[in-house]
């Protein structure tokens, strides 16, 4: 094929199922790397020894472990892992090819889901936010199930396609509370609620 028309990268693993993923070349050329070590030592087998593909902004399932082959092409390969296992179901029953880009997301890590607070008063609501398309611009927190939102503080540095820690000061008076967070990234994308996702995707 004409290499000037290349748009996608195929990554294949050496595991028993030959895990294979197609990644947009634009993402693969944006700070991607082939890792052979972690924390000053060789990759451990469970983490993909001897080689693992790392692509910032792309979901971890596309960070192929036990990497044995990379191939460049001008159209997706439609591997079994992309047409049978990893697809997005739509409301009308059809499906679309799995989207591997990490949309802007956030999660509250403390207090964690289902946790019973032992005392009323001050609590630091904290969590992580990230975006596969840019940087975290702001995070908002709701303590009443999404009826009202207030801005959280962001820890620095705030880096491109990286986790960002956030904090929200909350004084709990003992009432029932439903904690939620939502992030807005540098593209203007706002993290949707689960109800909004179900309306769009049907699942």
What are these regions (language model features)?
Residues 1-203:
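Structured, non-membrane catalytic/scaffold regions adjacent to prosthetic-group chemistry
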């Amino acid at each position: 094929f004409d290499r000037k028309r290349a748009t996608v990268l195929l990554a294949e693993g050496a595991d028993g199922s030959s895990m294979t993923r197609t990644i947009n070349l634009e993402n693969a050329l944006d700070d991607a790397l082939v890792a052979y070590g972690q924390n000053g030592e060789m990759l451990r087998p469970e983490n993909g020894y001897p080689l693992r593909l790392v692509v910032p902004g792309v979901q971890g399932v596309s960070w192929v472990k036990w990497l044995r082959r990379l191939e460049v092409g001008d159209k997706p390969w439609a591997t079994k892992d992309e047409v049978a296992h990893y697809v997005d179901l739509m409301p009308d029953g059809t499906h679309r090819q799995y989207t591997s880009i990490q949309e802007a997301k956030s999660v509250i890590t403390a207090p964690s889901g289902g946790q019973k607070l032992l005392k009323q008063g001050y609590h630091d609501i904290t969590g992580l936010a990230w975006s596969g398309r840019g940087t975290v611009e702001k995070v908002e927190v709701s303590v009443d199930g999404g009826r009202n939102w207030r801005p959280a503080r962001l820890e620095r540095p705030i880096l491109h396609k990286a986790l960002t820690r956030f904090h929200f000061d909350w004084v709990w008076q003992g009432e029932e509370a439903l904690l939620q967070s939502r992030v807005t990234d540098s593209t203007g994308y706002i993290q949707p609620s689960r109800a909004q996702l179900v309306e769009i995707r049907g699942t």
